[in-house]
């Protein structure tokens, strides 16, 4: 990732706070939109969502200033590191504190979410390995590939360069999973 030119400054702290605040606002407004929609307030729901989208863009602007966005390979590595911290340190620490304070059900939730974060880390590391070994769109074994745009199916070791049905690029193909 690019160097953070604000490292060690109050401005860096301000950018981090701005990023956190905008990110939290985005999520809150998304949740508020769901409530408004359930209560029959479609316009209010839409306005919460519109504002949430604005907040997302504000957060992105500050995160870019912090040099937090890079290429996919580096983004996957950073995401895996973040998920690792969450499941190995953060949620376990939160669970211990909750237990000490008598909040046993909350402690169990913290640990359960920690397990989910562990799976997120594993997923990101597997995807990173696919990039590092050039196994994103080509596998050593025959796979069923599906175009995420039109649903076209291809059986083989490699996704086509272009979907023969909708002409979308190879990047739209994924290994098909049927878990139903």
Predicted regions and their residues:
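Non-heme di-metal
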Residues: 1-180
